[in-house]
Amino acid sequence: MKNPDSKPEAEVIHRERAGEGFLVAAQKDRYSQELLIMGGQLNLKISERDTDGALCVYDATLVSKGGPALHRHQAQDEWFYVIRGEFMVRVGGDTFNLHPGDSAFAPRKVPHAYAMISEGEGQILLLYQPAGSMEEFFHQLSKMGKEIFENPQVALKRLFEEHGMEVIGAPLKF
């Protein structure tokens, strides 16, 4: 017999995975959505809907140097894989310079940041495992537009916290 004072059990949601494989063309998004974030294009390649929330993968094309603030995810691991350009990635106390073909891994709860440090266009794959609410995070971030630049500390801190992340410090300096 169930205790009437006990908390309700969490409902388990089972989503249908894609029944077949799929192709996402170069420079295209899985759902043809355009996410522009701080001058870069973010294309979703594998969605949380494709993997029952197990992971999501983004292809980010950046046109200017820089990257996000030092932060940590409470529930997601993050993997970085460089396709074009040179990137600096900090994970905990280690800093790595990544070139095309190099990758770095940031376990959940470990502070990390990345920045494009080369001239011209750069391209990096970002994988989040599990997906969590990263897709919603990037959609909201892209909608913020100028608000990011007008009051970045307040706007980004709130957005990060709403999606299980914490801003720890400033973006990487190089």
Where are the regions that the model predicts?
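A contiguous, mid-protein "functional segment" used to position or interact
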Residues: 120-161
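Conserved short histidine dyad/triad with adjacent acidic residue
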Residues: 40-47, 58-73
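Residue-level recognition of conserved beta-strand positions in structured domain cores
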Residues: 59, 72, 91-93, 100, ...
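A short, N-terminal "cap"/entry segment at the start of jelly-roll beta-barrel domains
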Residues: 1-55, 147-174
